[in-house]
UniProtKB/Swiss-Prot annotation:
It catalyses: alpha-D-glucosamine 1-phosphate = D-glucosamine 6-phosphate. The active site is at residue 102. Its cofactor is Mg(2+). GO terms for biological process: carbohydrate metabolic process; peptidoglycan biosynthetic process; UDP-N-acetylglucosamine biosynthetic process. Binds 1 Mg(2+) ion per subunit. Transmembrane segments: none annotated. The modification Phosphoserine is found at residue 102. This is Phosphoglucosamine mutase. PANTHER family: PHOSPHOGLUCOMUTASE (ALPHA-D-GLUCOSE-1,6-BISPHOSPHATE-DEPENDENT), PHOSPHOHEXOSE MUTASE. It comes from Salmonella arizonae (strain ATCC BAA-731 / CDC346-86 / RSK2980). InterPro entries: A-D-PHexomutase_a/b/a-I (IPR005844), A-D-PHexomutase_a/b/a-I/II/III (IPR016055), A-D-PHexomutase_a/b/a-II (IPR005845), A-D-PHexomutase_a/b/a-III (IPR005846), A-D-PHexomutase_C (IPR005843), A-D-PHexomutase_C_sf (IPR036900), A-D-PHexomutase_CS (IPR016066), Alpha-D-phosphohexomutase_SF (IPR005841). One of its GO terms (molecular function) is phosphomannomutase activity. Activated by phosphorylation. Its EC number is 5.4.2.10.
Length: 445
C-alpha cells in the first residue's frame, strides 16, 4: 500500500472536530469520492452510520458533497457495518459508506467505503479519491445534482439476511441468550434476529443516546455481559461492538470466548458438515492453541498481519473461506464479504443446537495457551530495538527454551513508539517471566 495522506487500513478515523473528522473535510471527501465513483457509471451511494451523535453532522456533510458531484445518497439510519456492505450489493449501488469508529469511544468517528461487491474499496480507488481532494470543489449543473432518500425497512432487510445464514432445519427454541449490543448499531437488529429464530432473549446495551456507545458494554468490555449471563442463568451471552463487525461470546459459566475460539468452533463444524473449503486464517496474535487444535483436525492454518483487511487478503490469496482475529472479527466468505458479528454468532449457535452441546463444551477441544503481552516504550531515533544484538540473543534463548510448545512475537506499534512483546506457552508463570526478560532487554537499548 502506497503512502496515503488520509486513508488508513480501515478508512479514515479520528477525533470529531479535529482534522480530518470535521464537517468541511467530510463535505470535500463526499465530493471527491463522488467525482471518482461517478466515472464508473452508477450514481447511487448507500450511507449508514452507528449511534454516535456526530453521525448526524457527518452524514449531512457527506450527502452535500456527493450531491454536488452529481451522486444520490440513500440513507439506512443506524446500521451495522456489515449491513451496509450487504445493502450495497443488493441495491447494486456504486459504493457504500459507513460512518463509524467501530469499538472506539463516542468522541471518535470515521468514514469507510465499500465497493459495489461489498468489499473494501481497491487501493487505486482510494488513491484517486485522495488525488481529487487536492482540487477545488466544483458543482455539477443544477439538473444533474444528486438527491437524498431513505431506504424503507433497511433493518428488516438485514434481519432477514442474517436469519438466512442460519440453517433452515434448526431453531433456537429453548435457548436463553443474553445479547449486548454496545449501545451501538445492532441495538435494533441482533435481539430481533435471535427472537425470530426462537431464542429467549435478554438484551443489554440497547439504549443508545449518542454518547454511550461502547461505554462499559460490548465486545471490548464483557463484564456486564458476564454478570448478566450468570444472574439470568442463561445458556450463553453474545457481545457485539459499536458497529457490529466484532463478536465475543460468554459461556454459561461466565467464561469469555474470543475470536480464536469462535473460529475454531465454526471451522470444526464446517469440517464435520463437509462444508469447509481449505483452511483457516488467523493473525500474528492468534493463540497458539488455535493453531494446534486446527492441526489436530487436519485443518491448514495461516497467519496474516494484524487487521481484518489483511485477514481478508490472505483468504483471497489462499482461496479459503474462514478467517478471524482474536479480537472478534470473524470473516465467513461463504456467508458475507466482511466481518459480521451477528452472522458469526449464529454459526456458533447452530453448532450448539446441531450437536446438543453447550458453548463451554464446544470450546473444550481447544486449549488456550497463556499469552502475555508487555508494551515497552522506546525513544524514536535512538536505534531500532528489534535489531539490537542483545535483544535478539535473549529472544533466541527464550524461543529455544519454548521449542514448538510456545511462541515469541516482537513488533512495533503502528501508532506509538512502543515495542509490543508477546510470549505464549503452556506454563503461565514461565511465559510471564520470559516476556519480562525480553522487555527488560528492550528497555536497556
Amino acid at each position: 500500500m502506497s503512502n496515503r495522506k488520509y486513508f488508513g487500513t480501515d478508512g479514515i478515523r479520528g477525533r470529531v472536530g479535529d482534522a480530518p473528522i470535521t464537517p468541511d473535510f467530510v463535505l470535500k471527501l463526499g465530493w471527491a469520492a463522488g467525482k471518482v465513483l461517478a466515472r464508473h457509471g452508477s450514481r447511487k451511494i448507500i450511507i449508514g452510520k452507528d449511534t454516535r451523535i456526530s453521525g448526524y453532522m457527518l452524514e449531512s456533510a457527506l450527502e452535500a458533497g456527493l450531491a454536488a458531484a452529481g451522486l444520490s445518497a440513500s440513507f439506512t439510519g443506524p446500521m451495522p457495518t456489515p449491513a451496509v456492505a450487504y445493502l450495497t450489493r443488493t441495491f447494486r449501488a456504486e459504493a457504500g459508506i459507513v460512518i463509524s469508529a467501530s469499538h472506539n469511544p463516542f468522541y471518535d468517528n470515521g468514514i469507510k467505503f465499500f465497493s459495489i461487491d461489498g468489499t473494501k474499496l481497491p487501493d487505486d480507488v482510494e488513491e484517486a479519491i485522495e488525488a481529487e481532494m487536492e482540487k477545488e470543489i466544483t458543482c455539477v449543473d443544477s439538473a444533474e445534482l444528486g438527491k437524498a432518500s431513505r431506504i424503507v425497512d433497511a433493518a428488516g432487510r438485514y434481519i432477514e439476511f442474517c436469519k438466512g445464514t442460519f440453517p433452515n432445519e434448526l431453531s433456537l427454541n429453548g435457548l436463553k441468550v443474553v445479547v449486548d449490543c454496545a449501545n451501538g448499531a445492532t441495538y435494533h437488529i441482533a435481539p430481533n434476529v435471535l427472537r425470530e429464530l426462537g431464542a429467549s432473549v435478554i438484551a443489554i446495551g440497547c439504549e443508545p443516546n449518542g454518547v454511550n456507545i461502547n461505554e462499559e458494554v460490548g465486545a471490548t468490555d464483557v463484564r456486564a455481559l458476564q454478570a448478566r449471563v450468570l444472574a439470568e442463568k442463561a445458556d450463553l451471552g453474545i457481545a457485539l461492538d459499536g458497529d457490529g463487525d466484532r463478536v465475543i461470546m460468554v459461556d454459561h459459566e461466565g467464561a469469555k470466548v474470543d475470536g480464536d475460539q469462535i473460529m475454531y468452533i465454526i471451522a470444526r463444524e464446517g469440517l464435520r458438515q463437509g462444508q469447509l473449503r481449505g483452511g483457516a486464517v488467523g493473525t500474528l496474535m492468534s493463540n497458539m492453541g488455535l493453531e494446534l487444535a486446527l492441526k489436530q483436525l487436519g485443518i491448514p492454518f495461516a497467519r496474516a498481519k494484524v487487521g481484518d483487511r489483511y485477514v481478508l487478503e490472505k483468504l483471497q490469496e489462499k482461496g479459503w473461506r474462514i478467517g478471524a482475529e482474536n479480537s472478534g472479527h470473524v470473516i465467513l466468505l461463504d456467508k458475507t464479504t466482511t466481518g459480521d458479528g451477528i452472522v458469526a454468532g449464529l454459526q456458533v449457535l447452530a453448532a450448539m443446537v446441531r450437536n446438543h452441546m453447550s458453548l463451554h463444551d464446544l470450546c473444550s477441544g481447544m486449549k488456550m495457551f497463556p499469552q502475555i503481552l508487555v508494551n515497552v516504550r522506546y525513544t524514536a531515533g535512538s536505534g531500532d530495538p528489534l535489531e539490537n544484538e542483545a535483544v535478539k540473543a535473549v529472544t533466541a534463548d527464550v524461543e529455544a527454551t519454548l521449542g514448538n510448545r510456545g511462541r515469541v512475537l516482537l513488533r512495533k506499534s503502528g501508532t506509538e513508539p512502543l515495542i509490543r512483546v508477546m510470549v505464549e506457552g503452556e506454563d503461565e508463570a514461565q511465559v510471564r517471566a520470559f516476556a519480562h526478560r525480553i522487555a527488560d532487554a528492550v528497555k536497556a537499548v
